[in-house]
Swiss-Prot record:
Entry protein name: Mitochondrial import receptor subunit TOM40B
GO molecular function: porin activity; protein transmembrane transporter activity
Annotated keywords: Ion transport, Membrane, Mitochondrion, Mitochondrion outer membrane, Porin, Protein transport, Transmembrane, Transmembrane beta strand, Transport
Protein's cellular compartments: Mitochondrion outer membrane
Function: Potential channel-forming protein implicated in import of protein precursors into mitochondria.
Family: Belongs to the Tom40 family.
Gene source species: Mus musculus
UniProt-annotated stretches for the region Required for mitochondrial targeting: 281-308
Length: 308
């Protein structure tokens, strides 16, 4: 009796498993490439500032700001914000209308609209008393793995002047984003364009970003050491002004003390720091800042109180 070769039925043969790759994420907006690094650095403070925030409803809130400084006259700002019902993310609500008016009548206004699921529009207006200074219109389309933006700044058909800015970002991998910016300006007797290439690499605990073009270069590095410590390094070079700046920022969070400390040191011999303290259970935040420029022998300090 011959040997019998037992074959498994075709239905029981092992099949090769194909791992389904995750789709590439949207790279976000071009203006937010250096956002993580910039948030590490402290905002310069000078004088005394009082800010009172008031939430009138789930859609509308106002803020009153009084600023007194030795460098100028005291000023008052009224800030209003309206947020609609369409919330795409914790930080994105449509439509959104934001306005800020000072005691002299100057106005800064911004309107954000969601025209379609992937198409967004923004309008920015800035006036100085009764004169228009800036009017800007943006259109942004966010695909699955890319973002395209077109901006028109101060369009004037009569004066034949306009500023056009085009942005494009593409996710190459889950960590690498590449893109560019094209700035075109036109006015009587002058016309030109500037091209800038951009790239961002995101790791688990750090992000490196680079913008380079004929107008200069901008590089930043953000590193999150742990939940309390974040650092940022920034390099900026401007070919038109023949100026180069190197900055180091430090961000320290003390959750048990409800305190946040931000500090910076740059190549212009400037040292600065801002300390924020939340006075719980009161809805009050105190901030104290000081900045010293050794090269120009200038010292600025500020104190602010935020209620609400």
């Amino acid at each position: 009796m011959g040997n019998t070769l037992g074959l498994a039925p075709m239905g029981t043969l092992p099949r090769r498993s194909h791992r389904r790759e995750e789709p590439l994420p949207n790279p976000g907006s071009f203006d937010e490439l250096h956002r993580l690094c910039k948030d590490v650095f402290p905002a310069q403070m000078e004088g005394v500032k009082l800010v009172v925030n008031k939430v009138l409803s789930s859609h509308f809130q106002v803020a009153h700001t009084v600023h007194m400084s030795a460098l100028g006259l005291p000023g008052y700002h009224l800030h209003t914000a309206y947020a609609g019902d369409w919330q795409l993310s914790p930080t994105e609500v449509f439509p959104t209308v934001v306005g800020d008016m000072d005691s002299s009548g100057s106005l800064n206004a911004q309107v954000l609209l969601l025209l379609a699921e992937r198409l967004r529009a923004k309008a920015v207006f800035q006036t100085q008393q009764a004169k228009f200074l800036t009017w800007q219109f943006d259109g942004e389309y966010r695909g699955d793995d890319y973002t395209a933006t077109l901006t028109l700044g101060n369009p004037d058909l009569i004066g034949e002047s306009v500023i056009m800015v085009a942005h494009f970002l593409q996710s190459i991998t889950h960590r690498l984003v590449l893109g560019g910016e094209l700035v075109y300006h036109r006015r009587p007797g002058e016309e030109g364009a500037i091209l800038t290439l951009a790239g961002k690499y995101s790791a688990v605990h750090w992000v490196a970003t680079l913008n380079v073009g004929s107008g200069g270069a901008h590089a930043s590095y953000y590193h999150k050491a742990n939940e309390q410590v974040q650092v940022g390094v920034e390099f900026e070079a401007n070919t038109r002004l023949q100026d180069t700046t190197f900055s180091f920022g430090y961000h320290l969070t003390l959750p048990q003390a409800d305190m946040v400390f931000r500090g910076l040191v740059d190549s212009n011999w400037c040292v600065g720091a801002v300390l924020e303290k939340k006075m719980r259970p009161l809805p009050v935040t105190l901030a104290l800042g000081a900045f010293l420029n050794h090269w120009r022998n200038r010292f600025h300090c500020g104190f602010s109180i935020t209620v609400g």
